[in-house]
Every structure is written in C-alpha cells, then in structure tokens.
Amino acid sequence: MSPVPWREKRDEVFWRGTDRGAVNWAVRVQDMYKGSPRKHFLDAWGGTGLFDLAFLEDDLLNATVVNTDPSFVPLDRWPEWRYLLDLPGNGYSGSLKQKLTSSSAVVLLTDVGVPGAQPVYEHYHSGLQDLVHVLQISMDDAGEKVQWARANDGRLEQMVQNSNDYMRAFDQLTRCYIWKLLDEYAQLLQYTPTHSQTSAFIGEVSVRTLKVQRRPLRREAAAFRARCQQLLEEYAQ
C-alpha cells in the first residue's frame, strides 16, 4: 500500500467488501439477515458522515467488475482514508493483515450484535490490544468511538505505529514457526517403505508419536521467540 501523509488522509472510516457465502436453505431469510453483521452494520451506519461504506458487485465469475463497479477502490488506495474498518463476514478477514501493515488506523468490529456469534480471525489476532494496536467497536457504539478517534488524533497515529511494529515482529515469528514446523515434519517422514510382491502395497511406517500439546507458558513463548530471532539472524549471514 502506498503511504499517504496522515494529515492528508480523508477523515472517515473506509470499508469495501461483499457479503457472500454458502446459503443455508433451512434458515429463513429474516434469520439470515439477522446473522449478517455486514448488512446490519451498513444499514446502521452508512450515510452518517462518519463512514465511507459500500458493498461491491459480487460476480465471482467475472473479474472485470473491478472496471465497472463505481464503488470499487483498489487496495493500494485504501490508505487515502485515515481509518480502515474491518468487518467480520462468513469466515476470517483476509484483508486484516494488510490493514494492520498500512499507514491507517484499524477500526475492528468485535461485537456483531448477534448472541453467541464470534468473529473469526487468524493466528496473529490474539495479541492485538484495544487502543494499542486497533480501535475496537461494537454495533452500538461505533459512531461514538469514531468521534473519540477524531478528537484523539495523536493516539490513533501512535496506534498505526504500534500495529505496524506488531505485525513486523509477528511476521518474523511466523516465518520461524513455519521453518520449525517443516523441519519437524521432515523428521517424521524419514522412514523406509517396504513393498511385497504378494500384495499391491504394504507400507511399514514408523514415526515419532507426538505428545498432546498444550498452550505454552509465557516464558516458553519468550524463549521460542528469542531462539527464532537467533536462527533467523544466523540464516541471514
């Protein structure tokens, strides 16, 4: 995403997207609407002057809609807005990672207003903190939170730096984790297959049995990060 100076950004919360997904024919249309946070949010806050929100044409078989849809805005232009909204949909938010690495503040809807419904995020989401990396909002207090953001411009600008630093560190940790995962997987695949002429195939595979995993302690996670950093530095030399 191309950088845009903070003072030159549009003072609105920006979002573009679709609301597609598999249709559950056993659920009434009214109930499907109630469980659609994106439609509900756009109905509630679109046109209030605080948000720049729009659904895009949803034709999965025709990529040329990007040239004909008047609401379409390419990804590299998103930083023209000071705040980027992340709305949960039918699955995880594929664009949240890009928003957190941009030069704009991320406004994150965490309460969709549906009892028992929880947004789905990727592995890096657990460390994100409200008012540190993102501005968390709900269906009810979205307008109030955005007005607060406008009145606390310095806090939001620092939030951008915090989210960028967080994603930079997490990206490094992710690379190290994948590296270690593939190394462990390669060790598990070190076996000698056998073939019997009396049958099509008989494989005798012996691998290590992994123990039941648990959530690592803080000191264990810190040690893993330190070791990852050391390995990456050694690999870069």
Regions inferred by a protein language model and the residue ranges of each:
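Phosphate-/polyanion-interacting regions in eukaryotic proteins
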Residues: 1-74
